[in-house]
């Protein structure tokens, strides 16, 4: 009966499995609201609420396909409420805000002078942003290169890789009932045009949408000559932004080459130490800021190791250490 009352976006097929996933998400949001209410009640009880600035905003679209990790509006546009520490600025605003704007905004609201420049701009009692920018690159084990720019009316998407689908396999997401339904319909070629495009093996180089009227970005306007001027303007600003601040066109190996000249060597991590305890082992990293993982030799998935955790390997096992800018260390130990 609960599922009958669950509303899902029109582009999803009507399916109880999908509705069940959405119902779980809605209940999580309800629980979150209750927890936020507890924090606000505590602030009021402590006499701190009136002088507290609160930003309350969503995650990037939840785990649903075409939402989280997506460069479309379903993945980028987030609801947000800002509660200031005075009554000078109330009501709704329809200005563009990017997450990089939070740092300068907080400094402005706290009346703290900036000591260095920010990429973002303050939206505290101001409306300074003409465009927002977005990027997608790494999808867990896979990669993509998509960039976007938008103003209040239109969004332009640039696809650096046109030979792979928008869809990227993400193991966590593949466990959802929603993905199992979509995968099944895809195999039967029974998907709607919306998700068929998502699974399509190729992408157009550019996509242009009038997001003020076409929130779900169903109608690519690139083939309409009357939008040529809008396309050229957005493209020019996007190229400028990419040239000034985007290193995504470089492969990860090329980034390393840029970071380390030929006269420099990539620093190495220290070999971790194993400490026998009871029936298992403790891993002593001996490396500041390094992440540690381990797995049995016959396993494909790594387990994240936390300090002072006792591991119980079944047989020979591997330990992996990672720290950005350092050579990855992989060591096999015999039980």
Model features per residue range: what roles?
Residues 80, 92, 122, 132, ...:
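Conserved beta-strand positions that form and line the central face of beta-propeller blades
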Residues 77-81, 148, 155-157, 293, ...:
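Residues embedded in well-ordered beta-strands
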Residues 77, 189-206, 211-217, 221-303, ...:
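Long, internal low-complexity/basic segments
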């Amino acid at each position: 009966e609960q599922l009958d009352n669950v509303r899902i976006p029109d582009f999803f097929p009507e399916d109880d499995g999908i509705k069940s996933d959405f119902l779980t998400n809605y209940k999580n949001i309800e629980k979150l609201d209750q927890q936020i209410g507890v924090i606000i009640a505590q602030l009021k009880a402590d006499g701190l609420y009136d002088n507290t600035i609160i930003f309350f905003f969503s995650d990037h679209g939840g785990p649903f396909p075409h939402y989280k990790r997506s460069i479309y509006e379903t993945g980028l546009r987030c609801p947000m409420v800002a509660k200031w520490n005075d009554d000078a600025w109330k009501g709704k605003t329809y200005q563009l805000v990017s997450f990089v704007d939070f740092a300068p905004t907080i400094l402005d609201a706290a009346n703290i002078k900036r000591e260095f420049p920010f990429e973002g701009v303050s939206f505290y009692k101001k409306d300074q942003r003409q465009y927002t920018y977005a990027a997608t690159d790494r999808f867990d084990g896979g990669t993509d290169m998509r960039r976007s720019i938008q103003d209040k009316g239109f969004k332009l998407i640039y696809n650096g890789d046109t030979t792979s689908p928008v869809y990227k396999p993400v193991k966590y997401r593949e466990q959802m009932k929603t993905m199992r339904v979509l995968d099944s319909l895809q195999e039967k070629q029974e998907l709607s045009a919306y998700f068929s495009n998502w699974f399509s093996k190729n992408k157009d180089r550019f996509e242009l949408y009038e997001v003020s009227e076409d929130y779900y970005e169903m109608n690519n306007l690139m083939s309409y000559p009357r939008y040529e001027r809008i396309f050229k303007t957005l493209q020019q600003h996007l190229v400028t932004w990419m040239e000034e601040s985007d290193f995504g066109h470089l492969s990860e190996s090329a980034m390393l080459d840029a970071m380390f000249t030929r006269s420099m060597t990539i620093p190495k991590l220290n070999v971790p130490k194993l400490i026998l305890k009871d029936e298992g082992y403790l891993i002593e990293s001996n490396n500041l800021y390094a992440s540690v993982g381990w797995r049995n030799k016959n396993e494909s998935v790594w387990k994240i190791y936390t300090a002072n955790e006792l591991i119980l390997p079944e047989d020979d096992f591997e330990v992996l250490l990672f720290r950005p800018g350092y050579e990855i260390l992989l060591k096999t130990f015999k039980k």
